[in-house]
Amino acid sequence: VSAMESSVRIIGEYTGEGKFFLGEIPPYLDIIDVQKAPYKVKLTDSSFEIELERYVERDGTLYDRLLSKWAIYKEGVERDQLVSHAHQADEIHAFQNLPAIKLTSKKGLGGIIPNQYISDFTSLGISSATINVCITQFMHLTPRAGDIAHTYGGRTYYMDEGYLKSLLDVPLLEAAKRNIAVAAIILVEPAAKCVDPDLGVLLQHPDYERGVYTMPNMTTLESVNCYAAAFDFLAKRYCTADNRYGRIAHWIMHNEVDGGLSWTNMGVKPVTIFSDTYIKSMRMCYNIVRQYDEHAEVFASFSHSWTDISNVGDRKSTR
């Protein structure tokens, strides 16, 4: 699968008797629950190469098929049969060519913030760092004084420029001056803690029960577009050739997912369901940010325990 500048090319093959088609699975659809695939292309040859428009209008949103995965189905009467693994984009068109930040030492610093100790970056001799980026602390659905408008998917969202300048730009600029590779830890608060409650309702997972952070809601097109817009804005701002606001080199998704009930909550779920949702979130970030920085990496987040079980009783699942 190749996501090019204005189209998506899917190449594959299949064998067997019957009617087959290529199915598109956007993040807001659960591939296991799909009875009749809503977005499909009929296959007439066992080996195929299909090129589709990358951007399509869906329910008032200009959806980017970069976010979709693709699979082969066999047509059924009541239910279509999934006959292949789903496949994400292998190649992603990059808008620009940023140089990679090479690590010069093993030494790093966790959770950098704007304070009087920033000058210690030099004396510490660090080569990497992390920074918490909680998107629900600066993103709004309606404009407020001092906001920056950002349009994605045909919808406009608003970002608190004062927050960005003081809490993110300052440490990221200082890190960029020293060629420190910074990884952003992406966090989503539950609706009750969000600066914009309406945004919180949109991004809080529908099965959230408790905990510090929620798994993002990716069950509707509206929520997916909003979540994707946050990544698009962050990558556009913090992946530039001149590092005008600082640089985010890598992305860490959420917090300690092995303790998901407290740190990335979506209720009590089978491990397979939780993992599938988590991978959707990771993939959405990866596919978007790699357009701006082809060297960017996306990492999973786990607890800091090496020899003992961490978060005992906090990673429950049904079998």
Please place each PLM-identified region on the residue numbering.
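Alpha/beta-hydrolase-fold catalytic nucleophile elbow
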Residues: 254-255, 301
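Noncatalytic carbohydrate-binding groove/subsite architecture in carbohydrate-active enzymes
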Residues: 101, 230, 247, 274-319
